[in-house]
Amino acid sequence: MTRTFIAIAAMLALALPVHAQDDDDNDGFGMAGILSASNKEDLPPITLSAGMPLADAPWTLDSGTYYEFEIEADGSQELALVGPEFFRAIWIDEIVIEGLEIRPLGLDSVEFDEAGTMEIGFLAIKPGSYYMMIPGSTGETQRLEITIE
């Protein structure tokens, strides 16, 4: 009888933490969870133009936050933007080009042969220091430093 009582008490004690879960915390997310509008930020655009800086300042991002930014090319020159390490540290939700939505599995670079705008929506994931740059360029203004914290 004592053994049975001890066994039942032990099973009940092991089951208690399951019922102690704290579900009343408010993380600020809506129905879409981490993709909710309350977790979304817009970044300043990147400008692709011959001899012009890519951006005004480096980006500092928070891991777990959803971001959107535009790449605006003026068509002054055929220009690309590379950042393979950065693109592997984020999850790209969508790329929008003239109303067409693309949902890629990954990305290494983008290139503009003429004037246009591209919007990229992504979730910052892996903390670290990254960059996007115009390939073959050496100037500091042709490179955007990105930190994910």
Identify the residue ranges that each predicted region occupies.
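Sec-dependent N-terminal signal peptides
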Residues: 4-14
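Beta-strand cores of secreted/periplasmic/IMS beta-sandwich domains, seen most often
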Residues: 55-85, 119-125, 131-133
